[in-house]
Amino acid sequence: MSRIGKLPIKLPPGIKVSIEGNNVTLEGKKGKLFHRLPEFLKVHQQDGSLILENTADSRQSKAMYGLHRSLLNNAVMGVHEGFQKKLEINGIGFRAAVEGKKLVMNLGFSHPVVYEIPEGISVKVQDNTKLTIEGIDKCLVGAVAADIRGFYVPEPYKGKGIRYAGEVIRRKAGKTAQK
């Protein structure tokens, strides 16, 4: 049995849960999320918490037990508090701006890089170089942050590029002049 899967998921006040077979719908102050469980997992609500039960005994079901418990917990946290990732843009002339549902970035290329912001995600720009990505779906927030970072991964010589806030880039020494 999974140690993580056995743990109950505490429901904060104000979260509405509806369970229909293997479909779980969570609704909170930030929004609404839907999660579908595999056939071998059952969920029920008890004493202000959600409890998952594994009805199968296969190796795969044991692995999926902990995974789906974590995914449900992330959904509960998402509709209650939401998730955010912060990115920083380093480089001379590098900047970003939000125009409607598009993020426009000047990253030293001959053209601006335009990224279509997905539904359910909000991007805020401070000081033209600091991005904050917010949403209720943890997986989608992380994927959007990784997509944006992928446009110009920080390089080790000058440190130019898009990086996560607090990320440390290992710097390399450049070429030394030969005599």
UniProtKB/Swiss-Prot annotation:
GO terms for molecular function: rRNA binding; structural constituent of ribosome. One of its GO terms (biological process) is cytoplasmic translation. One of its GO terms (cellular component) is cytosolic large ribosomal subunit. SUPFAM superfamilies: Ribosomal protein L6. PROSITE patterns: RIBOSOMAL_L6_1. Transmembrane segments: none annotated. Keywords: Ribonucleoprotein, Ribosomal protein, RNA-binding, rRNA-binding. InterPro entries: Ribosomal_uL6-like, Ribosomal_uL6-like_a/b-dom_sf, Ribosomal_uL6_a/b-dom, Ribosomal_uL6_bac-type, Ribosomal_uL6_CS. Gene3D superfamilies: Ribosomal protein L6, alpha-beta domain. It comes from the Bacteria. Pfam families: Ribosomal_L6 (PF00347). Belongs to the universal ribosomal protein uL6 family. This protein binds to the 23S rRNA, and is important in its secondary structure. It is located near the subunit interface in the base of the L7/L12 stalk, and near the tRNA binding site of the peptidyltransferase center. Part of the 50S ribosomal subunit. NCBIfam families: L6_bact. PANTHER family: 60S/50S RIBOSOMAL PROTEIN L6/L9 (PTHR11655), LARGE RIBOSOMAL SUBUNIT PROTEIN UL6M (PTHR11655:SF14). HAMAP family: Ribosomal_uL6_B. This is Large ribosomal subunit protein uL6. It comes from Methylacidiphilum infernorum (isolate V4) (Methylokorus infernorum (strain V4)).
